[in-house]
């Protein structure tokens, strides 16, 4: 094989955005090695510039004529582009909120950013991976980096405990997922590319076998861990409470987006012959997530634990689009994850600012905050109200789109359950808003009474302010001006071949038993 044919099969230009992230990662390490601690003033901006360049590269790859690279191991279609963009953008905002936080914790900023970029790289590769080895390596890159980030503040016992729990539960879920993947490899006759696995299973007529069912259950268990879906959510509250706040901000968006990207690609490509079965399993997960997440969040006293259970509930809402299995369903998932990126990171930015100034994340300590810090109060209020689905904020339109897609697909009772649990979530979101805004001066918490003077010119606070303002504007405006995001989500689904061919494959598979019965 000559070099030209090899280059054509590799088509490495498809992973140009990931290449830019790799170069940025190496640049961060080299600059830190040469300049040491003096580089911390601007090394975060170097990483942000690299990530923004990767997002620009993704933009120019939209509707690529040949999105397949590495002989089918990676597909840079529009679906992967939108998810890779979400992950990269979440990393940008995370770096903005991390600079002051990491410096104040006494740890090295360059190493933190390097690990974060590695996690971003893993998530971006997961979003387009179409081959078992590529999926597993990408997933492990994301997972191991996440474990390291969770325990990054080594002097904090809570961070160490969270990292250990995350590692143990994550390793178990990885083993379960890997066993399910190995069953797929065997059932398909030794295939590793996703479409070849589906064809091999259909040809061998083992789609309804016990092995295929076990593989499906194990794969869903691995995905459920990544998206924090109940009952695979046990790690979420403890990790959210103990890990550095910028880390959980990234995990709540970047890791979740990677998990849903993997779910769409893996389930629709490999399991079209048991679509009803995996939709039934995800229906159970969605019901558990929406009920457990919203009900348990009512009793939380820590803001981070409350958002942990909120994250579990949000995963349940997004699963409605996956269960619908229609173009509108997949597009609604993408749209909701886009707006979830802004409203969730806006909330975490406010929590970081409050914890940096007060040293606590207890909900009761936010009492009367409006009188001392109006901008932070506004940002957190808009974020929480949007998460609750209050119009005309972005979260309202995201939920309407999800529920409408589910209703059109006939998921009437699941949509009604989503509406009821959304009302429950509004209670604990508004409780925090009311505490910050409505309290009288004499009801102000002791922490807020001693609230330090607001000084944005301190080192690392300006990026936090920029992150807060940008996410606040996006959360407020994305709802009113949602049409461009709707169009983007719809186009990403309509232009993705696997989501269109899946309908044909599932129709053909469902017709096989009928043809056999007619022959008999």
UniProtKB/Swiss-Prot annotation:
Compartmental location: Cellular thylakoid membrane
Catalytic activity, reaction form: a plastoquinone + NADH + (n+1) H(+)(in) = a plastoquinol + NAD(+) + n H(+)(out); a plastoquinone + NADPH + (n+1) H(+)(in) = a plastoquinol + NADP(+) + n H(+)(out)
Cellular component terms (Gene Ontology): plasma membrane-derived thylakoid membrane
Keywords tagged on the record: Membrane, NAD, NADP, Plastoquinone, Quinone, Thylakoid, Translocase, Transmembrane, Transmembrane helix, Transport
Keyword Repeat part of the UniProt annotation: no
Enzyme Commission number: 7.1.1.-
Pfam families hit by this protein: Ndh2_N (PF19530), Proton_antipo_M (PF00361)
Classification via InterPro entries: NADH-Q_OxRdtase_suN/2, ND/Mrp_TM, Ndh2_N
Ranges that cross the membrane: 15-35, 42-62, 79-99, 106-126, 132-152, 167-187, 210-230, 244-264, 280-300, 306-326, 334-354, 378-398, 400-420, 466-486
Topology relative to the membrane: Multi-pass membrane protein
GO function terms (MF aspect): NADH dehydrogenase (ubiquinone) activity; quinone binding
Domain of life: Bacteria
Gene Ontology biological-process entries: ATP synthesis coupled electron transport; photosynthesis, light reaction
NCBIfam families: NDH_I_N (TIGR01770), PRK02504.1 (NF002701)
Quaternary context: NDH-1 can be composed of about 15 different subunits; different subcomplexes with different compositions have been identified which probably have different functions.
Family named by the database record: Belongs to the complex I subunit 2 family.
Purpose: NDH-1 shuttles electrons from an unknown electron donor, via FMN and iron-sulfur (Fe-S) centers, to quinones in the respiratory and/or the photosynthetic chain. The immediate electron acceptor for the enzyme in this species is believed to be plastoquinone. Couples the redox reaction to proton translocation, and thus conserves the redox energy in a proton gradient. Cyanobacterial NDH-1 also plays a role in inorganic carbon-concentration.
Full protein name: NAD(P)H-quinone oxidoreductase subunit 2
Species name: Trichormus variabilis (strain ATCC 29413 / PCC 7937)
């Amino acid at each position: 094989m000559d070099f030209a044919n090899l280059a054509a099969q590799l088509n490495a230009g498809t992973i140009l955005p990931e290449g830019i992230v790799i170069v940025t990662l190496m640049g961060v390490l080299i600059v830190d090695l040469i300049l040491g601690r003096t580089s911390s003033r601007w090394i975060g901006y170097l990483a942000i510039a690299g990530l923004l360049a990767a997002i620009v590269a993704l933009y120019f790859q939209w509707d690529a004529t040949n999105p397949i690279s590495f002989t089918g191991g990676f597909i840079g279609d529009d679906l992967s582009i939108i998810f890779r963009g979400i992950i990269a953008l979440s990393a940008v905002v995370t770096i903005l909120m991390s600079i002051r936080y990491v410096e104040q914790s006494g740890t090295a900023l360059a190493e933190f950013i390097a690990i974060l970029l590695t996690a971003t790289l893993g998530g971006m590769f997961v979003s387009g991976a179409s081959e078992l080895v590529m999926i597993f390596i990408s997933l492990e890159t994301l997972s191991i980096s996440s474990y390291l980030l969770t325990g990054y503040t080594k002097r904090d016992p809570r961070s160490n405990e969270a990292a250990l729990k995350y590692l143990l539960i994550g390793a178990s879920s990885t083993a379960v997922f890997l066993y399910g993947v190995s069953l797929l490899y065997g059932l398909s006759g030794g295939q590793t590319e996703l479409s070849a696995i589906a064809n091999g299973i259909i040809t061998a007529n083992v789609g309804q076998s016990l092995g295929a069912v076990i593989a499906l259950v194990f794969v869903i268990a691995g995905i459920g861990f990544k998206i924090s879906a109940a009952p695979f959510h046990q790690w979420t509250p403890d990790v959210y409470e103990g890990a550095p706040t910028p880390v959980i901000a990234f995990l709540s968006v970047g890791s979740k987006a990677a998990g849903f990207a993997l779910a769409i690609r893996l389930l629709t490509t490999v399991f079209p012959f048991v679509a009803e079965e995996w939709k039934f399993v995800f229906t159970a997960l969605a019901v558990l997530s929406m009920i457990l997440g919203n009900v348990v969040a009512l009793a939380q006293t820590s803001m981070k634990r409350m958002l942990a259970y909120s994250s579990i509930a949000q995963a349940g809402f997004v699963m409605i689009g996956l269960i619908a299995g229609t173009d509108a369903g997949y597009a609604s998932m993408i749209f909701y994850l886009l707006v979830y990126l802004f409203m969730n990171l806006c909330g975490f930015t406010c929590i970081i600012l409050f914890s940096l100034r007060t040293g606590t994340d207890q909900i009761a300590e936010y009492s009367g905050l409006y009188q001392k810090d109006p901008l932070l109060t506004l940002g957190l209020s808009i974020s929480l109200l949007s998460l609750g689905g209050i119009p005309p904020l972005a979260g309202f339109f995201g939920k309407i789109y999800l529920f409408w897609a589910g209703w059109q697909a006939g998921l009437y009772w699941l949509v009604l359950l989503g509406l009821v649990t959304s009302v429950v979530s509004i209670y604990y979101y508004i409780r925090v808003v009311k505490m910050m805004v409505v309290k009288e001066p004499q009801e102000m918490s002791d922490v807020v009474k001693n609230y330090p003077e607001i000084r944005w010119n301190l080192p690392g606070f300006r990026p936090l302010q920029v992150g807060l303002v940008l996410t606040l504007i996006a959360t407020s405006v994305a709802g009113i001006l949602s049409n461009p995001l709707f169009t983007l989500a719809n186009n990403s689904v309509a232009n993705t071949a696997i989501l269109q061919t899946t309908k044909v494959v599932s129709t053909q598979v469902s017709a096989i038993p009928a043809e056999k019965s007619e022959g008999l």
